Amino acid sequence: MSVKDEINKLIETINYHNERYYNQDSPEISDYEYDKLMKELISLEEEHPELKRIDSPTNRVGGKPLDKFNQIVHKTPMLSLSNAFSEQDLRDFDKRVQEYVGENVEYVVEFKIDGLSVGLTYNNGEFEKGATRGDGVVGEDISQNLMTVKSIPLKINDKKELIVRGEVYISKDNFRKVNEQQEEQEQPLFANPRNLAAGSLRQLDPKLTAKRPLDIFVFNMENIEEYDLESHSESLEYLEKLGFSVSQSYKVCKSIDEVIEHIEYWTDNRGNLDYEIDGMVIKVNNIKQRDEMGYTAKSPRWAIAYKFPAEKKKTKIVDIIVEVGRTGTITPSAILEPVRLAGTTVSRATLHNEDYIREKDIKINDTVLVQKAGDIIPQVLEVIKEERTGDEIDFKMPEKCPVCSEPTIRLEGEAAVKCINMSCPAQIRRGIIHFVSRDAMNIDGLGESIITLLLNEKIIQDVSDLYYIKKEDVVDLERMGEKSADNLINSIEKSKENDLWRLINGLGIKFIGVKAAKILAYNFKDLDEVISATSEQLEELEEFGSIMANSVVEFFKEDKNMNVINKLKNVGVNTKSLDNTGEKVEKIFEGMKIVLTGTLPTLKRNDAKEMIEKRGGKATSSVSKSTTFVLAGEEAGSKLTKANDLGIKVIDEERFLELLKLSSKDEVKAVLES
């Protein structure tokens, strides 16, 4: 086989496994085997750079770091849109449109994705370059970074020059996961999904961008006049055929009343989406009518952006409290006079750290503006200083831990104030909360209040004590009772069978989160092998550096930690990796996209999601034309409505449990079609 054929074969194989992993959630090979294929391809491409293809999967992992971004002059200016803030603004826009082209007007309404706007250029069927919007005329060349975004095709079946505009974003779920990783590594949290997406694309090192779970929706062919297309909606369908990701939510509207109705629906329901939108974009659909209307110096006359009302509210800080995390970090929070914000009642907001409080000059009794960063995390936006009365009180971070009274420290170069007493009850409590959490040992019935009771009653002192609890220890606790006590004991007992990665993550080793725990569990057959591994051995693992490796080694050197592990072993907690020895489950949902909505009678949402994913399905957060079926419980809401509108199959929990008993994907399809 020639080198060229070898490279082509490797690319074909890797692309196949990427499809299985990213789009079907049904991998056929291990991460280790996948990495071996990638390394082999990288090696061949480095030896024969003339044979490297534009669509090589190695372009997805990022190239060499840049010193700076070069500038690109946009062939077609990336204009901004004029804004509408009210129904009257939209009706005025419609009136202006009709003055140009008459009453026979059709509009396309799309989400205004809250991300970073980019332009993509393709030539001869290959991705050529990509740039930020910049000032609309000149942008920054971020081609290398854009090539790492998996939803951007690097090859398309179109030999013409094609210029596409899109919005790079990060989903709410992935935003939460990235911030959880930041917290585990004691790094600053990102304020909102847009900042994370924009910051990720502007990294000078593309390998850092490649690690961020970025996505894109494309929404415009900038050189549409070179194509035989009559409408904007046709262009979106064409882009989708080429392999671009197009938001399925766009709607063709026959009148401005229909436009307004669609906008009102999404104003109320945008919180159900797994990504941020900050408005809706309204465009004249007909291309000839657009040409008749033309442009102003700054924006097209045939489009307008409707901005959702700002999600900000005024309230008062009645107190500032601090909490101790499981790593000892002391975090301040503002206690607020309750206020309705983005659909929920907000009574507290994060203040991050001492520097944040100083920078914004925040005091107790201040009147402030609050918002939900990314509609997720309540935060203090600014102090309304003109409303100060003189009763405001300065806040100082505590010099002693509020729980154990040991001195606190702030290391040079760090923003966090910490309690370094490893026996601090607050750290122990947070550590146990982490141990039982969904991404660790996943023990149902052990909420924060129960854990606090168990600690206060001296029933437990560390995580291993959970497995020595008897029913009589807990049955008389507040809000417990016979049934709850039985459920709790059963849940604890069930968790003994968990895979090794859950235990490793639950132990709370500094810098080791879910992903690193899975890497350890895959590369070592049991916990004893992990414990005896040297830092040199650990550094050889993919994505492990010296800091993570040393953290693992140091953790297992501590007698206190080893005592806990020995107690866990003695009581029968699994310490072996089940990666290759677990029960085989047929992939009956392979390639299917399944949406969960509402409250199920007996199953928890996460359990149902795990059942779907274990069987090869993908549990998605929004209903679209590609959804296979919707699993609906009580109070299903807008997702159920949309599924019915699109003709998507809807089943209840009882039918879902019947599907789990089937032995093949074909059987599932037959049942769904019946």
Curated annotation (Swiss-Prot):
Positions contributing to NAD(+) binding: D31, Y32, E33, Y34, D35, S80, L81, E110, R133, E167, K283, K307
EC number: 6.5.1.2
A Gene Ontology term for the protein's cellular component: cytosol
Database matches in CDD domains: BRCT_DNA_ligase_like (cd17748), LIGANc (cd00114)
Active-site residues from the entry: K112
Cofactor(s) this protein cannot do without: Mg(2+); Mn(2+)
Transmembrane segments: none
Stored SMART domains: BRCT, HhH1, LIGANc
Molecular function GO terms recorded: DNA binding; DNA ligase (NAD+) activity; metal ion binding
Sequence positions that bind Zn(2+): C401, C404, C419, C424
Enzyme class per UniProt: ligase
Matching InterPro entries: BRCT_dom, BRCT_dom_sf, DisA/LigA_HHH, DNA_ligase, DNA_ligase_AS, DNAligase_adenylation, DNAligase_N, Hlx-hairpin-Hlx_DNA-bd_motif
Domain of life of the native organism: Bacteria
Swiss-Prot/TrEMBL keywords: DNA damage, DNA repair, DNA replication, Ligase, Magnesium, Manganese, Metal-binding, NAD, Zinc
Domain BRCT: from-to ranges: 584-673
Pfam assignment, any one: DNA_ligase_aden
Catalytic activity, reaction form: NAD(+) + (deoxyribonucleotide)n-3'-hydroxyl + 5'-phospho-(deoxyribonucleotide)m = (deoxyribonucleotide)n+m + AMP + beta-nicotinamide D-nucleotide
GO biological process, any: DNA repair
Membership in a protein family: Belongs to the NAD-dependent DNA ligase family. LigA subfamily.
Function: DNA ligase that catalyzes the formation of phosphodiester linkages between 5'-phosphoryl and 3'-hydroxyl groups in double-stranded DNA using NAD as a coenzyme and as the energy source for the reaction. It is essential for DNA replication and repair of damaged DNA.
Protein name as annotated: DNA ligase
